[in-house]
Amino acid sequence: KPDCPLICTMQYDPVCGSDGITYGNACMLLGASCRSDTPIELVHKGRC
């Protein structure tokens, strides 16, 4: 597994991931995708 050294702000700007989960912002989605076995893509801005 690669390191996932993302440091995200806590600014709330929700995005919906391809896993059906709402992330607090795009950076948080990228961090989750990095740690996941399957890539998570941004489906749309806003809550899922």
Curated annotation (Swiss-Prot):
- Name of one Pfam family that matches: Kazal_1
Q: List the GO terms this entry assigns under cellular component, sorted alphabetically.
A: extracellular region
Q: Where is the Kazal-like domain?
A: 1-48
Q: Does the keyword Ribonucleoprotein apply?
A: no
**S-S pairs:** 4-34, 8-27, 16-48
**What's the protein called, per UniProt?**
PI-actitoxin-Avd5a
Sorted keywords for this record are: Disulfide bond, Protease inhibitor, Serine protease inhibitor
Site, Reactive bond: residue positions: 10-11
Please list the GO terms describing molecular function. Answer: serine-type endopeptidase inhibitor activity
| GO annotation terms (biological process) | cell differentiation
Q: What does this protein do?
A: Exhibits strong inhibition toward Streptomyces griseus protease B (SGPB) (AC P00777).
Classification via PROSITE patterns: KAZAL_2 (PS51465)
Q: Could you tell me which Gene3D superfamilies the record lists for this protein? A: 3.30.60.30
